[in-house]
């Protein structure tokens, strides 16, 4: 025992003891754009948009659909029964089957696209959202099939289709079958165009590769979130290929808007209102709200006590009116 411990009263504790309070994990997070420390509940209330710099953070497909669709209207999932399979028995550094299992456990989804039918501001809509956490949101056979089923649901019911893209491109583990989804989804969008059903495409960070070269850039209206990376090959690959320095902000949403590649940039917090407004302009005022009550019946006007003058007594004015009616009938193309 040291001399200091001998001098201290016995009732005074010499150790700190167990910590009575601890900060829960995940209560604070860091913005990768401005490096600011953010309180997680405040960030969630701000729809995962940094309140300091406005950077839009990546969110899951389910979270995006939950923020976008009306809570009052029950959403019905489309193609949830479809399951991916390793039909090619593909293997690189790891078996494709193992990669699927790992991604399913990490995200809780069975593939990289979630499709639902719901409503936005009481307007019916079919919406798709990519899950970037599932193998980089890559497009395989299940993703292509779910998108096509969602497009067919929209076409059959004459309601708009909205797709939130967040993908690295086609899934290489499915080889040509994944590349075929580019043509398959493009054909589904073509059928929507023939039926004059609106298709709104929202590009989020990142939208690259085969997805950007097919369904993501075929919308009637193309929207992007601020700062989203959009393109086919990445900027680093392009610089190594052309051996030139790319312009500042190349392949970002603002750069694409300035060069006419997209129609508008919309903040995530305004996305619901903006898309609902576009749906009203493109698809008419269709609502799933309850039908209004029937209008009150109006009693017919009482018959006039004075009888109408016979046609013979109408005089020249009546004859002129008959001649005008005959000339209008002759000029009407429906009587040709």
UniProtKB/Swiss-Prot annotation:
One of its GO terms (biological process) is malonyl-CoA biosynthetic process. Residues 287-336 are annotated as: Disordered. Zn(2+) binds at residues 31, 34, 50, 53. Its EC number is 2.1.3.15. Keywords: ATP-binding, Cytoplasm, Fatty acid biosynthesis, Fatty acid metabolism, Lipid biosynthesis, Lipid metabolism, Metal-binding, Nucleotide-binding, Transferase, Zinc, Zinc-finger. Residues 27-297 form the CoA carboxyltransferase N-terminal domain. It is an enzyme of class 2 (transferase). NCBIfam families: accD. Acetyl-CoA carboxylase is a heterohexamer composed of biotin carboxyl carrier protein (AccB), biotin carboxylase (AccC) and two subunits each of ACCase subunit alpha (AccA) and ACCase subunit beta (AccD). This is Acetyl-coenzyme A carboxylase carboxyl transferase subunit beta. The lineage of its organism: Bacteria, Pseudomonadati, Pseudomonadota, Gammaproteobacteria, Chromatiales. The gene is accD.
């Amino acid at each position: 025992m040291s001399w200091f411990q001998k001098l201290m009263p016995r009732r005074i504790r010499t150790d700190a003891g167990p910590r009575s309070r601890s900060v829960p994990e995940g209560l604070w997070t860091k913005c990768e754009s401005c490096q600011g420390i953010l309180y997680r509940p405040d960030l969630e209330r701000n729809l995962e948009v940094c309140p300091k710099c406005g950077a839009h953070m990546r969110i899951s497909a389910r979270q995006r659909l939950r923020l976008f669709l009306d809570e009052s209207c029950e959403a019905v999932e489309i193609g949830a029964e479809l399951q991916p399979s390793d039909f090619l028995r593909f293997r690189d550094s790891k078996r494709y089957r193992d990669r699927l299992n790992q991604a399913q456990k990490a995200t809780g989804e069975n593939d990289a696209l979630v499709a639902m039918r719901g409503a936005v501001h009481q307007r019916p809509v079919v919406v798709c959202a990519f899950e970037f956490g599932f193998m980089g949101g890559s497009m395989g056979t299940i993703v292509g099939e779910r998108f096509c089923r969602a497009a067919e649901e929209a076409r059959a019911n004459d309601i708009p289709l909205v797709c939130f893209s967040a993908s690295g491109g086609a899934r290489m583990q499915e080889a040509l079958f994944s590349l075929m989804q580019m043509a398959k989804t493009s054909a589904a969008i073509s059928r929507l165009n023939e039926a004059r059903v609106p298709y709104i495409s929202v590009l989020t960070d990142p939208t690259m590769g085969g997805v950007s070269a097919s369904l993501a850039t075929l919308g009637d209206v193309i929207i992007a979130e601020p700062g989203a990376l959009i393109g086919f090959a990445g900027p680093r690959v392009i610089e190594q290929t052309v051996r030139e320095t790319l312009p500042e902000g190349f392949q970002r949403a603002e750069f694409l808007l300035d060069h006419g590649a997209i129609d508008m940039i919309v903040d995530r917090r305004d996305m619901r209102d903006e898309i609902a407004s576009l749906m009203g302009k493109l698809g008419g005022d269709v609502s799933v709200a309850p039908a209004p009550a029937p209008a009150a019946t109006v009693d017919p006007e009482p018959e006039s006590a004075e009888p109408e003058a016979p046609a013979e007594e109408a005089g020249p004015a009546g004859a002129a009116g008959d001649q005008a009616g005959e000339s209008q009938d002759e000029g009407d193309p429906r009587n040709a």
